[in-house]
């Protein structure tokens, strides 16, 4: 994951200090891109241990259209706890927009179902897009989408994905986001009978929080280790049928976890 360390180093060298919504302050750059060839291994950060269970369960939760943290809590995942209300609700966040985008006629649009249908029927389409950024509902969301829009692309029998992340918490959030969308790409490729291609991460406001600088500098002293392989249950042919047990990360070796506070 040299690409990730290069991003972190770039922000340390060129970032501008900015005040932010949380009151913590950030060092920020605008516009950055990383590319990961999924044939080279599964792009999960190795210079600190990442919590794969949280990554997988969160993605499955998104795909089910769920916006209440009960499923996450039941599976030992706490990454959304700070934003949920007393009933565990988050408002119309990712899962709602992905699966139930409100249409003007009062019905809803299942963007994920439409995406899979389009990849299968018209893989050369330039409209293979899912958006979580709904301006009409942003104010009702506990946290507006950071990873706002993703697009798929099919060429030579390979499926690639590009994510646009408007707000990128480099130390805590971005490692999760890279792994999550790389995993989604593997899943969609399998159910559409395609091979995985590239995952491309594009960031807007790419920032290190002021209280993550010491941790980032520690991480930059570490050498990346070889990437592991993600194995999916080959029997699963329906994207929404994947379960936690259908994933196996083989050969993941990482440096020790580095603790850092979440800016809420």
Swiss-Prot record:
Signal peptide: none annotated. Homodimer. It is an enzyme of class 2 (transferase). One of its GO terms (molecular function) is thymidylate synthase activity. InterPro entries: Thymidate_synth/dCMP_Mease, Thymidate_synth/dCMP_Mease_dom, Thymidate_synth/dCMP_Mease_sf, Thymidylate_synthase, Thymidylate_synthase_AS. It catalyses: dUMP + (6R)-5,10-methylene-5,6,7,8-tetrahydrofolate = 7,8-dihydrofolate + dTMP. Keywords: Cytoplasm, Methyltransferase, Nucleotide biosynthesis, Transferase. DUMP binds at residues 21, 126-127, 166-169, 177, 207-209. Transmembrane segments: none annotated. The gene is thyA. Catalyzes the reductive methylation of 2'-deoxyuridine-5'-monophosphate (dUMP) to 2'-deoxythymidine-5'-monophosphate (dTMP) while utilizing 5,10-methylenetetrahydrofolate (mTHF) as the methyl donor and reductant in the reaction, yielding dihydrofolate (DHF) as a by-product. This enzymatic reaction provides an intracellular de novo source of dTMP, an essential precursor for DNA biosynthesis. Its EC number is 2.1.1.45. One of its GO terms (cellular component) is cytosol. It comes from Ectopseudomonas mendocina (strain ymp). The active site is at residue 146. HAMAP family: Thymidy_synth_bact (MF_00008). Pathway: Pyrimidine metabolism; dTTP biosynthesis. Gene3D superfamilies: Thymidylate synthase/dCMP hydroxymethylase domain. Its main location: cytoplasm. GO terms for biological process: dTMP biosynthetic process; dTTP biosynthetic process; methylation. Pfam families: Thymidylat_synt (PF00303). It is found in: Cytoplasm. Belongs to the thymidylate synthase family. Bacterial-type ThyA subfamily. This is Thymidylate synthase. (6R)-5,10-methylene-5,6,7,8-tetrahydrofolate binds at residues 51, 169, 263. The keyword Nucleotide-binding does not apply.
């Amino acid at each position: 994951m040299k690409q990730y360390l290069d991003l972190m180093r770039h922000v340390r060298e060129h970032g501008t200090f900015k005040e932010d919504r949380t009151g913590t302050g950030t060092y920020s750059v605008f516009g950055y891109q990383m590319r990961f060839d999924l044939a080279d291994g599964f792009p999960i950060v190795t210079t600190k241990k990442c919590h794969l269970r949280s990554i997988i369960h969160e993605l499955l939760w998104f795909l089910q259209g769920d916006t209440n943290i009960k499923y996450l809590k039941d599976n030992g995942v706490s990454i959304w706890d700070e934003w949920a209300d007393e009933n565990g609700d988050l408002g119309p966040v990712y899962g709602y927009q992905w699966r139930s985008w409100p249409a003007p006629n009062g019905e809803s649009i299942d963007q994920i179902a439409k995406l899979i249908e389009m990849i299968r029927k018209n893989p050369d389409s330039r409209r293979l897009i899912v958006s979580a950024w709904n301006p009409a509902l942003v104010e009702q969301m506990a946290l507006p989408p950071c990873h706002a829009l993703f697009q798929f692309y099919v060429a030579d029998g390979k499926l690639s994905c590009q994510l646009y992340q408007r707000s990128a918490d480099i130390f805590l959030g971005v490692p999760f986001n890279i792994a999550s969308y790389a995993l989604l790409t593997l899943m969609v490729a399998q159910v559409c009978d395609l091979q995985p291609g590239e995952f491309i991460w594009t960031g807007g406001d790419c920032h290190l929080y002021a209280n993550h600088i010491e941790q980032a500098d520690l991480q930059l002293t570490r050498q990346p280790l070889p990437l592991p392989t993600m194995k999916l249950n080959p029997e699963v042919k329906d994207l929404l049928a994947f379960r936690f047990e259908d994933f196996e990360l083989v050969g993941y070796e990482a440096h020790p976890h580095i603790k850092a506070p979440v800016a809420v």
